[in-house]
């Protein structure tokens, strides 16, 4: 079961051919599933989630930064959300899912509106990733089977892990599509420097 869960998380947080656990090794860096060469990883689900978060944060925030302020009202069709709405959704879902995973209250934030400035919406998205980093820092796998409220139903806390990682993939893909439809190359499609 844990192997399937870890594989699902890795698949949902990997964009293209770039691995989610990339980066130079550091003695101060947290131990990751990829850095283990012998024996089982302690808390593999949360270890993989925490290792994936910085790259997801980097790519999603870079996509938001890449969209010009005057295009935050853009939506591909009348039935789709605006780019600003997507950014609001990213901030709100990060806060909600990380609070659920960590079993702590969501941060209190001012209501965000689609008419808010790019700077305000970008700051809210950035703050939501910072909140996730802090909220998830000490969570271990032992509580992931506990039931938590998901709307009108109870689900294991690990459902929030799936929702969060799946959301990151979906949100980046949507932002990349909005960028491309405006003639802007998404961050992960940029040539390496």
Regions found by a protein language model. Give the residues of each.
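Solvent-exposed, well-ordered amphipathic alpha-helical segments
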Residues: 13-16, 57, 128-132
């Amino acid at each position: 079961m844990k192997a399937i869960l870890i594989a699902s998380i890795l698949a949902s947080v990997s964009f293209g051919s770039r691995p989610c656990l990339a980066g130079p090794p550091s003695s101060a860096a947290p131990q990751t599933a990829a850095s283990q060469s012998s024996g089982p990883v302690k808390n593999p689900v949360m270890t993989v989630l925490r290792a994936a978060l910085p790259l997801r944060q980097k790519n999603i925030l870079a996509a938001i930064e890449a969209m010009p302020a005057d295009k935050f009202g853009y939506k591909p069709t009348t039935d789709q959300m605006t780019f600003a709405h997507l950014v609001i959704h990213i901030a709100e879902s990060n806060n909600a899912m990380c609070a659920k995973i960590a079993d702590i209250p969501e941060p209190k934030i001012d209501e965000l509106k689609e008419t808010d400035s790019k700077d305000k919406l970008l700051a809210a998205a950035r703050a939501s990733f910072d909140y996730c980093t802090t909220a998830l820092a000490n969570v271990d796998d032992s509580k992931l089977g506990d039931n938590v409220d998901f709307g009108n139903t109870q689900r294991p806390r690990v459902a929030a892990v799936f929702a969060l990682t799946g959301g990151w993939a979906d949100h980046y893909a949507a932002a990349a599509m909005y960028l491309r439809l405006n003639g802007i190359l998404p961050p992960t499609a940029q040539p390496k420097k």
